[in-house]
Amino acid sequence: MIQAMHAHLLPLVLLAGCAGAPMPADELARLDLDDLVAEACSPAAREPEYARHDASYRPAIIHELAQRLGWQPADVRRVTARQVWVGATREQVLAAWGRPWSTLRQVSRAGELQVWTYGRPVGPQSFVELLAERCISVTSYDR
């Protein structure tokens, strides 16, 4: 009887547990690098229309990444402005633009080339080429 009475609360509990709320700075500091980059790509950090978006969250993540990875002040400004440039690291591209729509991986004597596509096939698109986890090319165009 008790199970049946409270069964309607279960979806609410699960939703609250799954929702990506911004983490406090001390929790960000404890994340490993991959989890911190994933957090930079999260809706709470990237999407103003997200219910739990906090405008101060993305700068806190970028600050933590910059400290750990030794980013130059100019690079921090570019990532904060959502810019990607030739020479940017994989982490800087992800923190600036988030996860790509699709990826292509090619291995050759030169190393592993990755082409990250941002944007859907029917609208504006950008392509970021990474070699050895560094941006070597950024191409954008409208369709």
Describe each model-derived feature in a short phrase.
Residues 15-17:
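C-terminal motif of bacterial Sec signal peptides marking the signal peptidase cleavage site
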Residues 19-143:
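Residues within mature, well-folded domains
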